[in-house]
Amino acid sequence: MNSRFLILAEGAFSPLRSKTANACIRYTPQQVVAVIDSTRAGDTAQKVLGFGGDIPVVSSLAEGLARKPNALLIGIAPPGGQLPASWRALILDAIDNRLEVWSGLHTILGDDPEFAARARNRGVAIHDLRKPPADLDIARGRVRELDDRATVILTVGTDCNIGKMTTQLQLRDAMKERGMRVSFAATGQTGILVEGWGISVDAVIGDFIAGAAERLTLQAAKDADIVLVEGQGSIIHPSYSGVTYGLLHGSLPHAMVMCAQPSRTAINNHPWVRIPPLAEFIDMQERAAAPLRSAPVIAVALNTYDLGDAEASAAIDRVQRETDLPATDPVRFDPSPIVEAIDAFHRKRFDGVRSSATLGAGAR
């Protein structure tokens, strides 16, 4: 992907409200020329997010065009994933300036007659990251075929937008540095943008969510010993738990990594849904997985972006005491505690597989 992205995040560029923009800036900063948000114009990505260096925030498309982009990236994923009406004219203007459009919205821009005709006339492409394949099927438990050759790790969380994708990408990079055979299965539009492939499971017909997760997991396992599946939502989320359960049942993880934010006590935008204490939540999560597979939570990834260094370290120590599990913030600190927990779990599994195979051969 040789895109030079101008990212549209008008009125929303921030640590929590511009997930797609933030991931693109964190993992492919060399492809970002600027971010459009008139409310933060003059700032840099570093000032807004704490990373991204001197990528500028500009006030308008016209100002961004001066930096020679060749693509416009929709940098937010609002609740419901619909295109803000106020952005329509800007996107058409971008197409008129021969920018490709990359979108992770539920609104499929390529199916919109006006956008499609304008893009066709200008000779540019529209990439809808959330558009699912047409040939999806139901899940059939086929991930069990991996039991003797790969370990599947799913990130789960106490809420949405809490670090499930970022944790897996941090772990993937750290594992590759150690020479481990690992792959990342993207299940959301932002992960697809970063990784270059995947299926946005929240855009899939309900009957096929687990089937999409199954397909992704099997595909990711072709050249990997460890498959890191990007989690979505939360089992207690009143809006998105259906996706969470479909992903859990389709990917059939062997183990899970719990993602949490120490300062978050209720589901975002649903303050009436309180988040249980973490040890209790972990028990709930393991019981949710148990009918199809016993899958323990083996580590905790914390999102401490809103805490000072001392507070973050104290939160990690507290979680380790309360859960008796390794914990860290894999972005702020070293992800090694989680990497080592996964590696130990994987080795223990396959010591057991080899022992069973040896016993079976002896019995014959």
Over which residues does each language-model region extend?
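Short, hinge-like loop/turn segments at secondary-structure boundaries
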Residues: 50-54, 114-124, 144-147, 199-204, ...
